[in-house]
Amino acid sequence: MENKYVDLQENICSTFLQLFNTKMHWFKEMHPNDEKSIIDYTCTDRKDRKCHVELKQRLAKIDDYDTILLDATKLWAWTKIGYSDTLNDEQRLYFNFMNDGVIIYDINNQSEFKFYPRKKIWNPAEGKYEYRDKIGLPTKNAIIYRYNKDGTMTRVKNERYNKTYRD
């Protein structure tokens, strides 16, 4: 079933990923997964690793969050991919496009997961509140890029953000 809100969000996030990659050159190849896939993209990074990439747009600033919530079905989908594929060197990346930058989680290297069962959320695609299981990921364990006024991006380097995927 077609949902214009979902299609619009997918297009926006795809555009943000392409712009991010144009500036930062993380991926050599980027392929959107089909509509039935739970994970948005399959990419190949600069080290020739396969990356399973989930995208999310958030209408907020980076510093508004100390934890980003991930739908539990996404984490379970990544786990299923990990068990079904034979390659151990596959990356699971969660991109959050914010008003002032990008928060990226390397799921393979996350040690802190907080489970939020039956979290009440507004689903704009359905126009109603729903209860969903969520996984909390602390922003201190994320890779953070901030937008600069000249259109470039700068990797945040301070003690709040630990070493992860690209260091």
Residue map of PLM features:
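Acidic-basic catalytic patches of nuclease active cores, encompassing PD-(D/E)XK
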Residues: M1-N33
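Intrinsically disordered, low-complexity coil segments
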Residues: N21, P32-N33, R46, G82-Q91
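Beta-rich catalytic cores
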Residues: S37
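A short beta-strand motif that forms part of the nucleic acid-binding face
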Residues: W26, Q57-L59, N109
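Nucleic-acid nuclease catalytic cores
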Residues: G82-E112
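Mg2+/Mn2+-dependent nuclease catalytic core
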Residues: R58-I81
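Conserved catalytic cores of phosphodiester-cleaving nucleases, focusing on short active-site segments
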Residues: Y41-C43, K47-K61
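Intrinsically disordered, low-complexity terminal regions enriched in charged/polar residues
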Residues: I103-D167
